[in-house]
Design a protein with these regions (language model features):
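Hydrophobic H-region at the start of alpha-helical membrane spans
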Residues: 5, 9, 45-48, 71, ...
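Alpha-helical architecture
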Residues: 13-16, 47, 74, 112
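N-terminal signal-anchor/start-transfer transmembrane helix
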Residues: 8-22
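Feature marks short, highly hydrophobic, charge-poor N-terminal signal-anchor/signal peptide-like helices
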Residues: 1-3
Length: 201
């Protein structure tokens, strides 16, 4: 196999290992009363990363790896492990919060709100650049940024509800959180409809 093939093979094994860990943590979080937000977008996220890996294999399996970009990639893997270790059992590929649990404030979370997404954004671009695929890097960076922008909005909502539960001494029930989120969304829709109705008058 070429250098590119070894790199993509490493990424596939890494992603499978992360999915296994994420499923384990997700089950534990749900058993502890965790609430999932934005579940509908999860399959899109999986599809995007699957297409990214498939495209890297098809276009880059026989390419050499640029040593400079490879060094950046290695640093990103160290940052990824730091994030996972900092979140511990709360690390997952889904957006899940525990009502009443304080946000993680150790590791890179002392300085960044979403360090994991910083790693993902950079990795999506760095790997194809390491294989000499700048257009591929641009296309998937744009797609990934669009999807992450939505995911970050969802996660910020989830963190806001977690903070609400914490301020109530952990007394906010799972159903209350979920219903409150749904009510907030429904209210936003009604407001938008009313604004549109007034505009058309």
């Amino acid at each position: 196999m070429g250098e590119g093939a070894w790199l993509v093979a490493f990424l596939v094994v890494q992603r499978l290992a992360e999915l296994a860990l994420a499923q384990w943590n997700t089950a534990r979080l749900r058993a502890a009363g965790g609430i999932e937000f934005g579940a509908a977008h999860y399959l899109l996220l999986v599809a995007l990363h699957s297409l990214w890996l498939f495209g890297l294999w098809m276009l880059g399996h026989d390419r050499a790896i640029d040593p400079l970009w490879l060094a950046v990639f290695v640093l990103l893997q160290a940052a990824r492990l730091w994030v996972i270790a900092s979140l511990g059992r709360r690390w997952t590929t889904r957006v899940i919060v525990l009502p009443g649990a304080a946000p993680v404030a150790r590791g890179p979370y002392r300085w960044l709100r979403h360090p994991n997404y910083v790693v993902v954004v950079l990795e999506i671009a760095v790997v194809p650049l390491a294989l000499g695929l700048p257009l591929f890097a641009l296309v998937f960076s744009l797609a990934n940024t669009t999807l992450l922008a939505y995911r970050i909005r969802v996660e910020n909502q989830a963190l806001a509800w977690a903070a609400l539960a914490t301020s109530n001494g952990g007394s906010v029930k799972a159903g209350t959180v979920a219903n409150g989120y749904a009510s907030s969304f429904a209210k936003s829709v009604r407001t938008a409809k009313n604004d549109l109705r007034h505009t058309n008058r």
